[in-house]
């Protein structure tokens, strides 16, 4: 048994443990071809389907006659929501997740090995979505921290920009997307 174990261990190949994930794109390969670039920009859209980003139309409908709402939406609808209710922190986190994804695309797409027409389209989409997420945050919080690159942990305490500056950043992103 000892001899068989020694032979089995010595015959193992060292590169078996150095594998790449096949079920998801790593940060190094994410922007390496047109398909991955398209998926990266699609992930910015995916944030639109999450939590309070997606529920705003439903929440507005809840004000109508005969509408019903779920228990966890009641504080917002009744005007009694507090900072501790989680509604505002969820709203913040979900929008900044979209901004992070948009920034990742905006930073990496210019160097991606894809056609200029596809690159321009994807960059425009990323800039429009980043402007949209900042628009939504600025409308609620009247000034937020502004990031134009993927945020690192040591940047999490960045000071808040003025409301006017955020509007100007949104206008610039939309102007860039048009051009």
Locate predicted features.
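Short linear capping/connector segments at secondary-structure termini
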Residues: 22-26, 79-83, 148-155
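Proline-centered turn/helix-capping motifs that create local helix->coil transitions or kinks
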Residues: 15-16, 52-53, 67-69, 137-146
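Membrane-proximal, proline-rich intrinsically disordered regions
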Residues: 12-59
């Amino acid at each position: 048994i000892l001899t068989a174990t020694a032979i089995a261990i010595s015959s193992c190949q060292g590169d078996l443990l150095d594998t790449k994930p096949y079920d998801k794109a790593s940060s190094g390969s994410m922007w390496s071809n047109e398909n991955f670039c398209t998926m990266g920009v699609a992930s910015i859209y995916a944030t639109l389907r999450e939590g309070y980003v997606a529920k705003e139309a439903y929440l507005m409908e809840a004000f109508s006659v005969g509408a019903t709402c779920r228990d966890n939406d009641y504080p917002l609808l009744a005007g009694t929501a507090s900072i501790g209710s989680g509604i505002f922190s969820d709203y913040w986190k979900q929008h900044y997740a979209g901004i992070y994804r948009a920034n990742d695309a905006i930073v990496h797409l210019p160097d991606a090995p894809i056609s200029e027409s596809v690159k321009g389209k994807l960059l425009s989409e990323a800039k429009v979505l980043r402007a949209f997420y900042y628009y939504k945050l600025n409308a609620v919080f009247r000034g937020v921290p502004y990031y134009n690159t993927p945020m690192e942990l040591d940047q999490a305490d960045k000071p808040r920009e003025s409301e006017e500056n955020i509007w100007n950043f949104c206008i610039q992103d939309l102007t860039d997307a048009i051009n």
